[in-house]
From Swiss-Prot:
It comes from the Bacteria. Part of the twin-arginine translocation (Tat) system that transports large folded proteins containing a characteristic twin-arginine motif in their signal peptide across membranes. TatA could form the protein-conducting channel of the Tat system. The chain crosses the membrane at residues 1-21. This is Sec-independent protein translocase protein TatA. It is a single-pass membrane protein. GO terms for biological process: protein transport by the Tat complex. It comes from Rickettsia akari (strain Hartford). Coiled coil: none annotated. The Tat system comprises two distinct complexes: a TatABC complex, containing multiple copies of TatA, TatB and TatC subunits, and a separate TatA complex, containing only TatA subunits. Substrates initially bind to the TatABC complex, which probably triggers association of the separate TatA complex to form the active translocon.
């Protein structure tokens, strides 16, 4: 019950319409930075637990 290619295209089209061509690169950049910070935070949290053992 995953997303098919047509569903993915529809979602991308909606995002493009909502944010427009001008803002889309900035939105994607901010999203990537947020995901990277989240991933780093999860790794830091895991290493803190290892130190406490």
């Amino acid at each position: 019950m995953g997303m098919s290619f047509s569903h993915l295209l529809i979602v991308l089209l909606i995002i493009f319409v909502l944010f427009g061509a001008g803002k889309l690169p900035q939105v994607m950049s901010d999203l990537a930075k947020g995901l990277k910070a989240f991933k780093n935070g999860m790794q830091d949290d895991g290493s803190d637990n290892d130190k406490n053992k």
